[in-house]
């Protein structure tokens, strides 16, 4: 076996060396803590091998928050480098690595698992379902994502990170990027992408087949509707990217020439493949975010969502148009006027259904009895900030004007105004909103609001000046500039904004830690002062029972739960319990994830034999699973009755305590 040992150690500045020294101690420390508290068996049996959608969702969310920290550190490094002219904080290639990993981590390893985590926690509960359609696949999906995440983050200290940008354009990502860096990009995203595709298929079938029988599609909660439409985008878009990654992997490792002009390949083929996936990917993360806003705004406005059916059709329209706009990412790359005109118009058209959504949210707020809890603050801040991102998007959609905006900081500001306000605000709002459903207690609202104000103000301080920098000609991906360029002051202000955002995130961390220690535990399930409007609020808090619902709930309207509460039927209990069938835990996903991680690592360093051995291990695991006779197990009706009796008693005590305090 010829393994390139000389490529393992990354020789760089003090930050890389510090990370290389710290990483082994962090791993050893984590192992020591788990061993000291004797948690290995508990973690393996209750979490790593779990097929409970709620626990898998929490594991996704923990991973996403960790990646938010990693991506945020990258962002602070970028802003520190650009704070003053001719800064020596980062050298050119290290800067390229950092902005590449920042983009990949924030979109693929932060935003997507955040969305998938909330899908797992909320969607089956909103649908009145026991679990997802394919629980074992759900476990496998998570571990494939986790394997890709581990591999990509390993690149910083072992072998070197990719430095060709998050778009990884050929030929820069080919012959001009020697070493394992781009291989990390290709293999890690490929493994994670397979898991994402499996998740899309799983939730597509779950929403079709597992929702409560009386729930019709046009009456589903908006988060479930946007999830269903998003799964269609995942199923259609991810295979394209899977093929593109496989072709570039073949180019780099096996010497094919799909993206090399000299031998009949076509570099622009990669750009088309990437953006046929890449622009729908934006809507893969933003449509579920729209669904979250459509749950949070009616809750704290105490009103029905205005225009529910028009919201569904607008979501479908956005999803359809998302596949017809990819060329707007390279208007300047030599297309003819006819092609640019078509994609310019199709891009502008997306503003129509998006505008419908914005007006529906505003009309939901109109004459509502609004309370300003932190999820609502994020939702309200989203509307004007996202509008600015959308308007600048229409400016960029004009092909002739794009020749001036393209690859400047105007574009950087635009996509951060859409993705941060559209997705990150929603993820933070959704995490706070559904946190009591997962953990049984609310996060501290004072700290949450400090998080909001620092994060929202910091965001605008950071990115609003970048519109001006772009109009003044500052190119994106520029690692330094001269004093004579005149960009110092705005870059300095932008960096201050990034620091404010980091402080805001620290307030959220403080809220999580403080609330874990101090917050009162809640049992009612309808945690936001009884304002919940969908079925997940009818179940117990703190990871609801494995079976979710003791009886199958009825659902006749998208505000059925509000009507149920008005008539005193909000806890879905007729005492007519039956045995409930549930799936068994499985080790398949965990071990496939280990094989994927090890095999992917060897393939990154082009060591084929060990990679093939790990591939064989994956197939053996799948074959072993196929021969297992696993019919699941049943929770006896008597156990269901005991559980429900305990929950009723806890709810009574909680209501009495609230009445006594008032």
From Swiss-Prot:
PROSITE patterns per the UniProt record, alphabetical: COX1, COX1_CUB
Keyword Transport on entry: yes
Top EC class of this enzyme: oxidoreductase
Residues at which Fe(II)-heme a binds: 102, 416
Record function comment: Catalyzes quinol oxidation with the concomitant reduction of oxygen to water.
Native species: Staphylococcus epidermidis (strain ATCC 35984 / DSM 28319 / BCRC 17069 / CCUG 31568 / BM 3577 / RP62A)
Compartments, record wording: Cell membrane
Gene: qoxB
Family listed: Belongs to the heme-copper respiratory oxidase family.
Protein name as catalogued: Probable quinol oxidase subunit 1
């Amino acid at each position: 076996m010829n393994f390139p040992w000389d490529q393992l150690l990354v020789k760089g500045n003090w930050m890389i060396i510090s990370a290389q020294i710290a990483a082994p101690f962090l791993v050893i420390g984590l192992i020591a803590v788990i061993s000291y508290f004797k948690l290995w068996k508990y973690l393996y049996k209750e979490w790593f091998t779990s097929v409970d959608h709620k626990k898998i969702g929490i594991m996704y969310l923990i991973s996403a928050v960790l990646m938010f920290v990693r991506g945020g550190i990258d962002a602070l490094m970028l802003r520190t480098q650009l704070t003053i002219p001719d800064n020596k904080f980062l050298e050119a290639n290290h800067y390229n690595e950092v902005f590449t990993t920042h983009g990949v981590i924030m979109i693929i390893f932060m935003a997507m698992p955040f969305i998938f985590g909330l899908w797992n926690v909320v969607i089956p509960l909103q649908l009145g379902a026991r679990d997802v359609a394919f629980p074992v696949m759900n476990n496998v999906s998570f571990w494939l994502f986790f394997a890709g995440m581990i591999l990509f983050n390993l690149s910083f200290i072992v072998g070197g990170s990719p430095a060709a940008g998050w778009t990884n354009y050929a030929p820069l990502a080919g012959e001009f990027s020697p070493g394992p860096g781009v291989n990390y990009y290709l293999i890690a995203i490929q493994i994670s992408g397979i898991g994402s595709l499996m998740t899309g298929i799983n939730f597509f079938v779950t929403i079709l087949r597992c929702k409560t029988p009386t729930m019709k599609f046009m009456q589903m909660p908006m988060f479930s509707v946007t999830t269903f439409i998003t799964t269609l985008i995942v199923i259609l878009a991810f295979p394209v990217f899977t093929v593109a990654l496989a072709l570039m992997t073949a180019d780099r490792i096996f010497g094919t020439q799909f993206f090399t002009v000299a031998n009949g390949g076509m570099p622009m083929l990669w750009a088309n493949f990437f953006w046929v996936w890449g622009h729908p990917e934006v809507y893969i993360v933003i449509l579920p975010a729209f669904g979250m806003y459509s749950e949070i705004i009616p809750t704290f406005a105490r009103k029905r969502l205005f225009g529910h059916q028009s919201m569904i059709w607008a979501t479908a329209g956005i999803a359809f148009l998302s596949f017809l706009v990819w060329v707007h990412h390279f208007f300047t790359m030599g297309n003819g006027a006819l092609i640019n005109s078509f994609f310019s118009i199709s891009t502008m058209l997306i503003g129509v259904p998006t505008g419908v959504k914005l007006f529906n949210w505003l009309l939901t707020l109109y004459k509502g009895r609004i309370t300003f809890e932190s999820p609502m603050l994020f939702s309200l801040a989203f509307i004007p900030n996202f509008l600015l991102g959308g308007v600048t998007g229409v400016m960029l959609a004009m092909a002739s004007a794009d020749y001036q905006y393209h690859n400047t900081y105007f574009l950087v500001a635009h996509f951060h105004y859409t993705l941060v306000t559209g997705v990150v605000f929603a993820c933070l709002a959704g995490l706070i909103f559904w946190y009591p459903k997962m953990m049984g207690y609310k996060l501290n609202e004072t700290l949450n609001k400090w998080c909001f104000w620092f994060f929202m103000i910091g965001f605008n301080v950071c990115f609003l000046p970048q519109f001006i920098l772009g109009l003044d000609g500052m190119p994106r991906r520029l690692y330094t500039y001269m004093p004579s360029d005149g960009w110092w002051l705005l870059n300095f202000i932008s960096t201050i904004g990034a620091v404010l955002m980091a402080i805001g995130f620290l307030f959220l961390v403080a809220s999580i830690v403080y609330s874990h220690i101090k917050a009162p535990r809640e049992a009612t399930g309808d945690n936001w002062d009884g304002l919940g409007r969908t079925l997940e609020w009818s179940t117990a808090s703190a990871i609801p029972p494995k079976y979710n619902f003791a009886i199958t709930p009825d659902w006749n309207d998208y505000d059925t739960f509000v009507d149920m509460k008005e008539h005193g039927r909000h806890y879905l209990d007729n005492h007519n319990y039956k045995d409930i069938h549930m799936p068994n835990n499985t080790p398949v996903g965990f071990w496939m994830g280990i094989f994927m991680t090890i095999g992917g690592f060897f393939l990154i360093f082009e060591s084929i034999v060990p990679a093939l051995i790990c591939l064989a291990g994956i197939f053996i695991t799948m074959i072993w699973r196929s021969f297992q006779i696993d019919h699941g197990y049943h929770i006896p009706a008597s156990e269901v009755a005991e559980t429900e009796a305990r929950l009723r008693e806890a709810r009574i005590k909680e209501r009495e305590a609230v009445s006594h305090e008032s």
